[in-house]
Amino acid sequence: MRALLSVSDKEGIVEFGKELENLGFEILSTGGTFKLLKENGVKVIEVSDFTKSPELFEGRVKTLHPKIHGGILHKRNDENHIKQAKENEILGIDLVCVNLYPFKKTTIMSDDFDEIIENIDIGGPAMIRSAAKNYKDVMVLCDRLDYEKVIETLKKNQNDENFRLSLMIKAYEYTANYDAYIANYMNERFNGGFGASKFIVGQKVFDTKYGENPHQKGALYEFDAFFSANFKALKGEASFNNLTDINAALNLASSFDKAPAIAIVKHGNSCGFAIKENLVQSYIHALKSDSVSAYGGVVAINGTLDEALANKINEIYVEVIIAANVDEKALAVFEGKKRIKIFTQESPFLIRSFDKYDFKHIDGGFVYQNSDEADEDELKNAKLMSQREASKEELKDLEIAMKIAAFTKSNNVVYVKNGAMVAIGMGMTSRIDAAKAATFKAKEMGLDLQGCVLASEAFFPFRDSIDEASKVGVKAIVEPGGSIRDDEVVKAADEYGMALYFTGVRHFLH
């Protein structure tokens, strides 16, 4: 038996090589891997000695040789292949262990394009693909986490076709991921991120019980190990719908730096939000916005879920809590609640990945765009359109309302008072309907909107929403502006003594 080991990530390779040697494998290797194995007492043959061909062009050509690829690719049960191998002095290679040059790591650490180009692996992917293609005869490894499993399988003589098939699939996933990153990087560098092809690659974290509905399959995939590093289940398992709601709630609650923010979300839309002096007060005021919709919802906590907050949340049924951190006493509060699910990021405050791009599936393809972000500078740089200026407290509320609006389905309007959302209308086909739905709900919940502020994610096409806002005592408004009737909107704001700001930035969300 013969194995070829050539790795960039050398962790565990010496131990793996020794185990293979003990199992009777002849070891072939290249470059730094060869040197490391030899220094650590592994009997190893350099590939250039095996092929009788030197490494060429500063190591660019090492393993691209018929004796390597022929040794990997020829079928062991095909008489013609065996004959050709013998005629050409090609010896079988039965195990290929390769991981690739660190292209991604290089792009993160350096902008030197020559250095980046040199870290595009050529021989490695070729060997992995060859070994994967001939998986019926050859084992292929590209992940050091598989070393122990492979040794155990070989020792137990369980190296069957199904096991090699699983390694083959993993190998093609690995090379596809590698090439996809290279293509995306080149398009990012030279085509502004929007090249002729776009590759979206994620790693599976776990399967969900089902998808959006019970008849659909579902799973969570991640970019750059984000969930593996920042998502821990403390109680229960996340469903597909839980994950989309967690995403919406976490994005909003984490948008105010270290502020004690609480967001409550149902079906992807905010039904409660507040920033008060502490998390308990934030939760109390967030819940007031719509305690009916909060039932069975998702609560995001930008801080620690402690016993006091847990007791308050436990007064109603919520399905999911996602908190930056959770203490043991808080967990104990929910011991008797079988259906509640609790997740944490094990950090002082909630963490977002801040993905640079966003995409949505449409029938036959997907649309792809730069990610949207409601920055606080939008309000700082907004243009005052009215005669009246907003007070300092109103400006704080406007920032909250503006960010909630940016994370809410269009058309929407958001009312905020004293750091808490007091009304919201979302997902409506007309903005005036959103405004009316919000104030109707607030009245139903017994909330006093007098003195609140208002934000909209897009411009008001008519003055009717301003007229509606005046009925509940809105004092300040922020919106993008850009309507052909902006002058009517400004006039209405002045009539009612409202402060009105145009940001110039729209935040449609569909």
UniProtKB/Swiss-Prot annotation:
Q: Which InterPro entries match?
A: AICAR_Tfase_dup_dom_sf (IPR024051), Cytidine_deaminase-like (IPR016193), MGS-like_dom (IPR011607), MGS-like_dom_sf (IPR036914), PurH-like (IPR002695)
Q: Print the keywords alphabetically.
A: Hydrolase, Multifunctional enzyme, Purine biosynthesis, Transferase
Q: From the UniProt record, give the pathway where this protein acts.
A: Purine metabolism; IMP biosynthesis via de novo pathway; 5-formamido-1-(5-phospho-D-ribosyl)imidazole-4-carboxamide from 5-amino-1-(5-phospho-D-ribosyl)imidazole-4-carboxamide (10-formyl THF route): step 1/1; Purine metabolism; IMP biosynthesis via de novo pathway; IMP from 5-formamido-1-(5-phospho-D-ribosyl)imidazole-4-carboxamide: step 1/1
The reaction(s) this protein catalyses:
(6R)-10-formyltetrahydrofolate + 5-amino-1-(5-phospho-beta-D-ribosyl)imidazole-4-carboxamide = 5-formamido-1-(5-phospho-D-ribosyl)imidazole-4-carboxamide + (6S)-5,6,7,8-tetrahydrofolate; IMP + H2O = 5-formamido-1-(5-phospho-D-ribosyl)imidazole-4-carboxamide
MF terms (GO), sorted A to Z: IMP cyclohydrolase activity; phosphoribosylaminoimidazolecarboxamide formyltransferase activity
Known EC number(s)? 2.1.2.3, 3.5.4.10
Output one GO BP term.
'de novo' IMP biosynthetic process
What single Pfam family name could you report for this chain, choosing any that match?
MGS
Q: Which intervals hold domain MGS-like?
A: 1-142
Q: Which GO CC annotations does the UniProt entry carry?
A: cytosol
HAMAP family xrefs: PurH
Per its record, how is this protein called by name? Bifunctional purine biosynthesis protein PurH
> Origin organism of this chain?
Campylobacter jejuni subsp. doylei (strain ATCC BAA-1458 / RM4099 / 269.97)
Gene from which the chain derives: purH
